[in-house]
């Protein structure tokens, strides 16, 4: 059975998640990213052989080391930073590991849980992919050697599926609410408060006195600061 090597790309902790800036301060958003990463790591670390955080931000890399993760410093590129960073990390893995599968996860899916991980371990298809809301990719598992080209960005889910089919891979589309939720808006924070009670992220948001109520308006959830 191949070892699973997980890649988690993180561009920066600073000035991140700007769509949350009207609701959370910059330091609060930085700490949010940290606790979300802790949630992902805590749910996969017993099931994978290695976790590699790739970034060019020394702050991110140092925090990853603090969590006892391996790091890969992102190389300089003129464009398409995320996809080039992932390609470089995969190349690094191919030179330093034998008999491996690659799993790529974003750092902002704190509802990813051990049941999701066990699904990956049970199925081990050539290519497992989970869509995000809006057509992105929130999990990519590659269990066969081929010249994989990362296609993250707008509507990447459909591009990744087509690329896998073009390479004659058996594609398993793993549709999971918990994997689909990447955190970008206050409403997403509300979903964490509803569905993520056993997570570091839930505890962090609760300590910020953030509350959630059902809403019958444009947004399904009303998310608010209790002290305001």
UniProtKB/Swiss-Prot annotation:
Give the protein's function.
Guanylyltransferase that catalyzes the activation of (2S)-2-phospholactate (2-PL) as (2S)-lactyl-2-diphospho-5'-guanosine, via the condensation of 2-PL with GTP. It is involved in the biosynthesis of coenzyme F420, a hydride carrier cofactor.
Q: Which SUPFAM superfamilies match?
A: Nucleotide-diphospho-sugar transferases
Q: Which family is it part of?
A: Belongs to the CofC family.
Gene name, per UniProt, is cofC
Q: What is the name attached to this protein's record? A: 2-phospho-L-lactate guanylyltransferase
Q: Report the catalytic activity.
A: (2S)-2-phospholactate + GTP + H(+) = (2S)-lactyl-2-diphospho-5'-guanosine + diphosphate
Q: In which pathway does it act?
A: Cofactor biosynthesis; coenzyme F420 biosynthesis
Annotated InterPro entries: CofC (IPR002835), Nucleotide-diphossugar_trans (IPR029044)
Summarize the subunit comment: Homodimer.
Q: Which organism is it from?
A: Methanosphaera stadtmanae (strain ATCC 43021 / DSM 3091 / JCM 11832 / MCB-3)
* Keyword Isomerase assigned: no
EC no. given is: 2.7.7.68
Q: Which domain of life is it from?
A: Archaea
What are the GO MF terms of this UniProt record?
GTP binding; phospholactate guanylyltransferase activity
Print the keywords alphabetically: GTP-binding, Nucleotide-binding, Nucleotidyltransferase, Transferase
One of the GO BP terms on file? F420-0 metabolic process
């Amino acid at each position: 059975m191949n070892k699973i090597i997980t890649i988690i790309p993180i561009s920066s902790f600073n000035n991140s998640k700007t769509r949350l800036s009207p609701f959370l301060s910059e330091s609060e958003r930085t700490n949010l990213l940290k606790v979300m990463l802790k949630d992902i790591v805590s749910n996969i670390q017993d099931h994978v052989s290695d976790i590699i955080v790739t970034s060019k931000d020394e702050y991110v890399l140092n925090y990853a080391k603090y969590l006892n993760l391996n790091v890969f410093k992102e190389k300089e590129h003129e464009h398409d930073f995320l996809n080039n960073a992932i390609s470089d990390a995969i190349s690094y893995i191919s030179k330093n590991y034998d008999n491996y599968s690659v799993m790529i996860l974003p750092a902002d899916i704190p509802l990813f849980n051990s049941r999701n991980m066990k699904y990956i371990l049970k199925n081990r298809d050539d290519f497992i992919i989970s869509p995000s809301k809006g057509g992105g990719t929130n999990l990519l598992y590659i269990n066969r050697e081929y010249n994989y080209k990362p296609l993250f960005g707008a509507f990447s889910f459909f591009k990744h599926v087509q690329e896998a089919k073009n390479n004659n891979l058996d594609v398993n589309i793993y549709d999971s609410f918990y994997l689909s939720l990447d955190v970008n808006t206050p409403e997403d924070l509300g979903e964490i408060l509803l569905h993520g009670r056993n997570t570091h992220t839930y505890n962090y948001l609760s300590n910020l006195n953030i509350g959630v109520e059902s809403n019958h308006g444009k947004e399904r959830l009303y998310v608010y600061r209790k002290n305001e």
